[in-house]
Curated annotation (Swiss-Prot):
Part of the 50S ribosomal subunit. Keywords: Ribonucleoprotein, Ribosomal protein, RNA-binding, rRNA-binding. It comes from Streptomyces avermitilis (strain ATCC 31267 / DSM 46492 / JCM 5070 / NBRC 14893 / NCIMB 12804 / NRRL 8165 / MA-4680). One of the primary rRNA binding proteins, this protein initially binds near the 5'-end of the 23S rRNA. It is important during the early stages of 50S assembly. It makes multiple contacts with different domains of the 23S rRNA in the assembled 50S subunit and ribosome. Forms part of the polypeptide exit tunnel. This is Large ribosomal subunit protein uL4.
């Protein structure tokens, strides 16, 4: 179990917090598990509403364009056949559901593996708050988060009730904000650093699923 410092908006050290080993230090990081869960998550985000009209769905074309024989041309039954301009589309996309079935235990294990990777590279941070006081300030939030991490993309985890932090950081283009219950594998991996407020960290740790057999499978990163 490793220990990290808790930083205050003023830049001072406000104490330390322990990162539970069952969440932030699993024995082996499974790359195939992370890949499978991220692919499933991105697939589930697809709308799948793409649609084209086939020849039977395109308006018009009910009349035979010319007689069957005697013209010297190939026989045609409708101007909405796919070989005509304005005709239907053959083998085009239809609405579908791209979501994949992913067991809850697999999602939870993948999140622990992603957090372990960030923790081992010193990219997990805990702060007392995003700003000092209750008055929202995007300028103050940007300055403080820039001191916490110099990397580009930051995942900020705050409590739902922390309105001052939300209003202060939501307009920062490189900061993505989530609540503890929304934390997921993709957002952890796509961000350079994960920054928890102290309240959000305690909430996440108390409600996070514990390690299981899935954490012992896969290759070590």
């Amino acid at each position: 179990m490793s220990t990290i410092d808790i930083l205050s908006p003023s830049g001072d050290n406000a104490g330390t917090v322990e990162l539970p080993a069952e969440i932030f230090d699993v024995e082996k990081i499974s790359i195939p598990l992370l890949h499978q869960v991220v692919v499933a998550q991105l697939a589930a985000a697809r709308q799948g509403t793409h649609k084209v009209k086939r020849r039977g769905e395109v308006r018009g074309g009910g009349k035979k364009p010319y007689r069957q024989k005697g013209t010297g041309r190939a026989r045609q039954g409708s101007t909405r056949a796919p070989q005509f301009a304005g005709g239907g589309v053959v083998h085009g996309p239809t609405p579908r559901d791209y979501s994949q079935r992913t067991p809850k235990k697999m999602k939870a294990a993948a999140l622990r593996h992603a957090l372990t990777d960030r923790a081992r590279n010193a990219r997990i941070h805990v702060i007392t708050g995003v700003i000092e006081g209750e008055t929202p300030s995007t300028k103050a939030a940007k300055s403080f988060l820039g001191k916490v991490s110099e990397r580009k993309n930051v995942l900020l985890v705050i409590e739902r009730s922390d309105e001052a932090a939300l209003l202060s950081a939501r307009n920062l283009p490189q900061v993505h904000i989530l609540e503890p219950g929304q934390l997921n594998t993709y957002d952890v991996l796509v961000s350079d650093d994960v920054v928890f407020t102290q309240a959000a960290f305690e909430s996440f740790v108390s409600g996070a699923p514990q390690s299981s057999a899935a954490d012992t499978e896969g290759s070590e990163a």
